[in-house]
């Protein structure tokens, strides 16, 4: 950790429109969620979070010593259902973690009202949402705390990495210390070239700092984002929407492509035909994914003992089509042609 990390943090702050010092880079998005959770809540506290998210979200909460409480999603957006979340509040609930699924932040106004009503911290898992806006404001420029991911397939990559963004100085101080084994103020000393061998540790910490090499990659990626990566992702998502919206066997998520830069291109395949379509596309040379298996079905997080019927239905319909800035419109059209062919014959 050194000058490149400091430069990357400062450039991210400028991009997001926040003050220098409000961005803390770490070595993964999972680490960002873990450190933010550890800084925001205490051991044994509960965090409301949708089950339909990458297991890294749950493992990060678990590693922070908190308890993830699985909630339903809204089928139209695959974002957290606040009505269901309200039913799961207990005296131990201390935070809500909205997941910006496929770059869609959902109704953040409602989420922050909900949090204020119940006295909760809001830790946004914005791993998919770098570069997205909400009501004209950049995700990361407002609210409580946001966690970004810069792994190899995200909107920008540093090879591997993540960041915590917050205007809360107590939160930031805890995250900065915890990313480097809990050593108090070590980040500031290192950046100032005044590293001291005399230090104290008062809170648990981890080895989660970002290296200079990863930060240097991230800086170049950030320079390419607005003019290259973002417009290409948006254009490809629009083309998918134009070609797939008319198909009666598919449901597209209710996403406004104006303010978001889509990380994924998920669709819902209706009528129990998801797996058949996936097999058809594989035979046509089209790789697909399923984002994600709900966490409440995983052994560590309940093994399905508490059913979430809406989430389970959405999961059974989910299929992610190829989306990355290296694709061209012709690639999207070939994928959609294979999808159309399936529905014409099934």
Describe each PLM feature range.
Residues 1-46, 60-63, 70-72, 137:
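Phosphate-binding glycine-rich loop
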Residues 3-11, 17-21, 83, 95-99, ...:
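PLP-dependent aminotransferase class I/II
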Residues 24, 48, 69, 122-123, ...:
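Structural detector of well-ordered beta-strand residues that form the stable sheet scaffold
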Residues 39-126, 133:
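PLP-dependent aminotransferase-like
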Residues 47, 96, 146, 162-164, ...:
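Well-ordered beta-strand positions enriched in small/hydrophobic/aromatic, beta-favoring residues
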Residues 52, 66, 73, 127-128, ...:
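Histidine-centered beta-alpha loop that forms part of the nucleotide-sugar donor binding/catalytic region
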Residues 124-158, 197-202:
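Conserved active-site segment immediately N-terminal to the catalytic lysine
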Residues 141-185:
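Active-site PLP attachment segment
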